A protein has these predicted regions:
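Extracytoplasmic/secreted cell-surface and envelope-processing proteins
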Residues: 23-24, 46-50, 76-79, 104-110
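Acidic (Asp/Glu)-rich catalytic clusters
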Residues: 4-5, 23-33, 51-64, 82-93
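Short beta-strand/loop segments at the ligand-binding rim of alpha/beta enzyme cores
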Residues: 8-10, 65, 125-128
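Surface-exposed substrate-engagement region within the catalytic domains
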Residues: 31-36, 80-132
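A cross-domain feature marking catalytic cores of carbohydrate-active enzymes
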Residues: 16-18, 41, 68-72, 98-102, ...
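Broad hydrophobic/π-residue packing in well-ordered secondary structure
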Residues: 19-20, 26-27, 36, 51-56, ...
């Protein structure tokens, strides 16, 4: 079966989290035209995606660009910002992204989401990505 990304053509970006099972062959994905990974780093004020750090290392080793996202919830925006920035370890090439979507446990409101984004932008001096 032909992978969808081989039909669409490069450059392509894939979204990963701990919900995507291993093994993931980043070299094979790169050969198929995937040039960037956006990976969940954190959620809320305490969850850390256990696959973030090892997959970051493997994706970069395969020659891909790498970006981190934070799955926002209704907990404290300042707490979420602090948590995300501590875990994501955003280097100068990364902007960070905030994922805002319905969450059965704790959906962030638009006002809170805008405040969270503004806090990250102010702290880093760059504009983070809005991801939904």
């Amino acid at each position: 079966m032909t992978a969808l990304w081989t039909v669409l053509g490069p450059p392509l970006v894939i979204d990963l989290s701990h919900n995507n099972p291993e093994p993931i062959d980043f070299a094979a994905l790169y050969a198929d035209g995937v040039r960037m990974v956006i990976h969940k780093a954190t959620q809320g004020s305490s969850f850390v995606d256990p696959m973030y750090a090892p997959r970051r290392k493997r994706a970069l080793a395969a020659g891909m660009k790498f970006e981190a996202y934070h799955f926002a919830d209704a907990s404290s925006p300042v707490g979420q910002m602090t948590h995300f920035l501590a875990v994501a370890n955003l280097d100068g090439k990364m902007r960070g992204a905030i994922d805002v979507e319905p969450n059965h446990n704790s959906t962030i409101g638009f006002g809170q989401a805008n405040f969270l984004v503004s806090q990250i932008d102010q702290k880093r001096g760059t504009q983070c990505l809005r991801y939904t």
